[in-house]
Amino acid sequence: MPMFYSSRFLFFFTIVPLLVSIALYQLDTFDPAPVPSEAYASSTTSIPPLISDKYLTGAEFIGVGLLDKPEDIAYHQDSNLIYTGCIDGWVKRVSVHDSANDSVVEDWVNTGGRPLGIAFGVHGEVIVADAYKGLLNISGDGKKTELLTDQAEGVKFKLTDVVAVADNGVLYFTDASYKYTLHQVKFDILEGKPHGRLMSFDPTTRVTRVLLKDLYFANGVSMSPDQTHLIFCETPMRRCSKYYINEERVEVFIQGLPGYPDNIRYDGDGHYWIAMVSGASTLWRLSMKYPFLRKITAIAAKYGVELMFMKNAGVLQVDLDGNPIAYYHDQRLSHITTGIKIGNYLYCGNILHSYIIRLDLLKYPAQKKKL
């Protein structure tokens, strides 16, 4: 009798779930593709000499409870205000003070979508890459919101992500994926197919051009200080590349990053700051290498089970040639989407918390140590 119940238990709680899992795998139409080897390279080649691996130890939190997932940050020096976009559709303005507790948060403009990338136009307007709306122009101190573009070459944007503004007024931006929306980001990464595009919009001619296509989740964009090229990031590839505007050619800027890049910001002082939404873990690398693991992960996600976890996020400082200088990260940190240096502080946006994270770089400098 004990043997009978033991066998039945084994059948119902082991064999049946296994058979159901196999059936779900076979029937699911999600079809991940093999990806280039850069996506699962085991080594981190871009290792900076200076490391700060306890970012949260000295961190301050700005706008706690008032900034719901502030994804990108733009700083307006004349007014000493930070502009950031939140998940509730609000572009908010935050005053910058020596004390984080003195910061004041203002609901400025609601786009009715999900504002992500933010930049300032040449005439003082605020340009917003809205994940659902497209590229927006906010002018008249927030009184007027205009849609600039939401499609290119007959293909609608699915995930307008980041925008950078050239000195001549041309806007450069990414549609991270023409197939998946913001709520489906994980499936774009797991599918392993290049759905991203780098584009430009000329406000004078109103023409939208596709500069590059077939990018792997095209994310952050930054204009070079000499205005000759852009730096753009491909998140799953762990690399950032240069796009030369006049020559229309591409070359690698930095690769083998310690994490998965999101936004990239130039600080006006010879450095770019690359946000890492998560560190590069062994589990992530294995999943990128083997499509069947990505399919299992995607099926689980459809049923509300997360098999992939994000941790050890941070911000990498590099010079104009892509040489790594310092890395500020923390094992407890995740979903960091933006890093921008304002004065002596590093401000970080994210898609997890209800605040902006700030670190005093003079009080908590990176030190010489191994990554």
UniProtKB/Swiss-Prot annotation:
Classification via Pfam families: SSL_N, Str_synth
Expression induction or repression: By salicylic acid (SA), jasmonic acid (MJ), ethylene, abscisic acid (ABA), dark and infection with the fungal pathogen A.brassicicola and cucumber mosaic virus (CMV).
UniProtKB keywords: Glycoprotein, Phosphoprotein, Signal, Vacuole
Signal peptide positions (record): 1-23
Glycosylated residues (UniProt): 101, 137
Biological process terms in GO annotation: response to ethylene; response to fungus; response to jasmonic acid; response to salicylic acid; response to virus
Domain of life per record: Eukaryota
GO cellular component terms given for this protein: cytosol; endoplasmic reticulum; vacuole
Matches recorded under InterPro entries: 6-blade_b-propeller_TolB-like, Strictosidine_synth_cons-reg
Tissue: Expressed in cauline leaves and flowers.
Modification Phosphotyrosine occurs at: 303
SUPFAM superfamilies attached to this UniProt entry: Calcium-dependent phosphotriesterase (SSF63829)
Compartment annotation: Vacuole
Disulphide bonds in the chain: none
Family: Belongs to the strictosidine synthase family.
Protein's name in the database: Protein STRICTOSIDINE SYNTHASE-LIKE 5
Phylogenetic placement of the source organism: Eukaryota, Viridiplantae, Streptophyta, Embryophyta, Tracheophyta
Designated gene of the protein: SSL5
